[in-house]
Amino acid sequence: MSSTLVLETTAYTLEQLIHLDAPQIALAGRSNVGKSSLVNALARRKQLAKTSSTPGKTRSVNYYRVEPEGFYIVDLPGYGYAQCSKEERKKWAKLIEKYIVSCKSLRGLAVLLDCRLDPQRLDVDLTSYARANNIPLLPVLTKGDKCKLRERSDRQKQWAVLLGGRKPLVTASMTGLGIADLWRELRALAAGGLSADDEAEDAPSDTSDAIDDVTA
């Protein structure tokens, strides 16, 4: 099945967040992890989501409707960008927190992880938060084309240890690596086909603390 994305609406404030009955999968990740590029790769369009070499480009919650299936992929603001103001980071944190807490149709959280980097604390915090709160987790390594095959394998193993044996998918927006596999996982997640990982022993369960951690 061939799917694409249509940008339906964008929310910059808490009041602009919308309530949808259709299943939703949130995309989360550090600033400059390649979320916008991945959205474009999924949509097979170059400029659906604006990309930038400057971290922190996505400062809103973007709702993309998946056609023809009808579920939504929701792109959340990137976290960990130290160059923006503290007030701006707090604003993003509240926006992310409100979305996750209030979204009754959230089917899972796709966390994007830079394949070039060892597991980062903010990413570990977010994946632990998802597992502790029984949010089905889909870990995705981005920029796989920037790493050698051995590096990809090593990074998958590192994350598997942290995620109870779950290896993340490897993707590359520029080459299309892993995009078809990612679509299969997203469809299954939207349909409720993936179960949540086992709860992490030391994972934070309080929403505001966890979200503040990853946006601080």
UniProtKB/Swiss-Prot annotation:
<comment type="function">
    <text>Necessary for normal cell division and for the maintenance of normal septation.</text>
</comment>
<keyword id="KW-0479">Metal-binding</keyword>
<dbReference type="InterPro" id="IPR019987">
    <property type="entry name" value="GTP-bd_ribosome_bio_YsxC"/>
</dbReference>
<feature type="binding site">
    <location>
        <begin position="142"/>
        <end position="145"/>
    </location>
    <ligand>
        <name>GTP</name>
    </ligand>
</feature>
<feature type="compositionally biased region" description="Acidic residues">
    <location>
        <begin position="196"/>
        <end position="216"/>
    </location>
</feature>
<feature type="binding site">
    <location>
        <begin position="29"/>
        <end position="36"/>
    </location>
    <ligand>
        <name>GTP</name>
    </ligand>
</feature>
<dbReference type="GO" id="GO:0000917">
    <property type="term" value="P:division septum assembly"/>
</dbReference>
<dbReference type="GO" id="GO:0005525">
    <property type="term" value="F:GTP binding"/>
</dbReference>
<dbReference type="InterPro" id="IPR006073">
    <property type="entry name" value="GTP-bd"/>
</dbReference>
<feature type="binding site">
    <location>
        <begin position="170"/>
        <end position="173"/>
    </location>
    <ligand>
        <name>GTP</name>
    </ligand>
</feature>
<keyword id="KW-0460">Magnesium</keyword>
<keyword id="KW-0717">Septation</keyword>
<keyword id="KW-0131">Cell cycle</keyword>
<feature type="binding site">
    <location>
        <begin position="75"/>
        <end position="78"/>
    </location>
    <ligand>
        <name>GTP</name>
    </ligand>
</feature>
<protein>
    <recommendedName>
        <fullName>Probable GTP-binding protein EngB</fullName>
    </recommendedName>
</protein>
<feature type="binding site">
    <location>
        <position position="36"/>
    </location>
    <ligand>
        <name>Mg(2+)</name>
    </ligand>
</feature>
<dbReference type="GO" id="GO:0046872">
    <property type="term" value="F:metal ion binding"/>
</dbReference>
<dbReference type="InterPro" id="IPR027417">
    <property type="entry name" value="P-loop_NTPase"/>
</dbReference>
<feature type="domain" description="EngB-type G">
    <location>
        <begin position="21"/>
        <end position="192"/>
    </location>
</feature>
<dbReference type="InterPro" id="IPR030393">
    <property type="entry name" value="G_ENGB_dom"/>
</dbReference>
<keyword id="KW-0342">GTP-binding</keyword>
<feature type="binding site">
    <location>
        <begin position="56"/>
        <end position="60"/>
    </location>
    <ligand>
        <name>GTP</name>
    </ligand>
</feature>
<keyword id="KW-0547">Nucleotide-binding</keyword>
<keyword id="KW-0132">Cell division</keyword>
<dbReference type="Pfam" id="PF01926">
    <property type="entry name" value="MMR_HSR1"/>
</dbReference>
<feature type="binding site">
    <location>
        <position position="58"/>
    </location>
    <ligand>
        <name>Mg(2+)</name>
    </ligand>
</feature>
<feature type="region of interest" description="Disordered">
    <location>
        <begin position="195"/>
        <end position="216"/>
    </location>
</feature>
<comment type="similarity">
    <text>Belongs to the TRAFAC class TrmE-Era-EngA-EngB-Septin-like GTPase superfamily. EngB GTPase family.</text>
</comment>
